[in-house]
């Protein structure tokens, strides 16, 4: 198992949930946290603990976004019209690394970030190597021609464990995807329940 995989599954173990729905997640085999003391029974979490856990889970899901970056996204969500929690999810789902993952161009959020950083992705015909780039409805995302036959791409398109959500139109024969609309929380195919309202409560303390 690579260091990247170890870090990814450590998030699962810490949360005690298979947050990406992966068949190889260690929490499919055990229900306790990482480390030698992970089997100890945990007490009931305080309201603060529940809110913090919700934040850590969502940050972890999106490839362990840094606290500084995540808080910036929260502030941006609060400036938009509508529900802050819904806006938070909308911004996260518009990230280029998220769209590349959702389109099944790569198999994990972590791989999506690396794939973009290495210059394998174009948006509307222009190379974009910033994982946090905000995609807009109507944008077309594509894998560069020279990258379409990479093993990481070919393997990801065959994954049976998840489907492309309906707010993205993906054509794997051309390795292109069109971002149709900004999704609501209920549209996003999370493998576990995400609770952005608890994150709003956390930052509103």
UniProtKB/Swiss-Prot annotation:
BP-aspect Gene Ontology terms: ribosomal small subunit biogenesis; translation
UniProt region (Disordered), positions on chain: 18-46
One Gene Ontology cellular component annotation held by this UniProt entry: small ribosomal subunit
Keywords, sorted A to Z: Ribonucleoprotein, Ribosomal protein, RNA-binding, rRNA-binding
Domain S4 RNA-binding: 94-154
InterPro entries per record: Ribosomal_uS4 (IPR022801), Ribosomal_uS4_bac-type (IPR005709), Ribosomal_uS4_CS (IPR018079), Ribosomal_uS4_N (IPR001912), S4_RNA-bd (IPR002942), S4_RNA-bd_sf (IPR036986)
Pfam families, per database record: Ribosomal_S4, S4
Molecular function GO labels: rRNA binding; structural constituent of ribosome
Function: One of the primary rRNA binding proteins, it binds directly to 16S rRNA where it nucleates assembly of the body of the 30S subunit. With S5 and S12 plays an important role in translational accuracy.
Subunit structure: Part of the 30S ribosomal subunit. Contacts protein S5. The interaction surface between S4 and S5 is involved in control of translational fidelity.
Family the UniProt entry places it in: Belongs to the universal ribosomal protein uS4 family.
HAMAP family: Ribosomal_uS4_B (MF_01306_B)
Annotated NCBIfam families: PRK05327.1, rpsD_bact
Name this polypeptide is given: Small ribosomal subunit protein uS4
Organism: Bradyrhizobium sp. (strain ORS 278)
Organism placement in taxonomy: Bacteria, Pseudomonadati, Pseudomonadota, Alphaproteobacteria, Hyphomicrobiales
Chain's gene name: rpsD
């Amino acid at each position: 198992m690579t260091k990247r995989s170890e870090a990814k599954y450590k998030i699962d173990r810490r949360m005690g949930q298979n947050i990406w729905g992966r068949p190889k997640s260690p929490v499919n085999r055990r229900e306790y946290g990482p480390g030698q003391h992970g089997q100890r029974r945990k007490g009931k979490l305080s309201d603060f603990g529940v809110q913090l856990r919700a934040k850590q889970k969502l940050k972890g899901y999106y490839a362990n976004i840094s606290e500084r970056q995540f808080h910036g996204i929260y502030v941006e969500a609060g400036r938009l019209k509508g529900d802050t929690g819904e806006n938070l999810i909308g911004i996260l789902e518009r990230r280029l690394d998220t769209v590349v993952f959702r389109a099944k161009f790569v198999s994990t959020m972590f791989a999506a970030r690396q794939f973009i950083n290495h210059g394998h992705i174009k948006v509307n015909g222009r190379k974009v190597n910033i994982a946090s780039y905000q995609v807009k409805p109507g944008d077309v995302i594509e894998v560069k021609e020279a990258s379409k036959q990479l093993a990481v791409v070919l393997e990801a398109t065959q994954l049976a464990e998840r489907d492309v959500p309906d707010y993205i139109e993906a054509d794997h024969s051309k390795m292109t995807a069109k971002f149709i609309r900004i999704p609501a929380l209920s549209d996003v195919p999370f493998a576990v329940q995400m609770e952005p309202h608890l994150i709003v409560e956390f930052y509103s303390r």
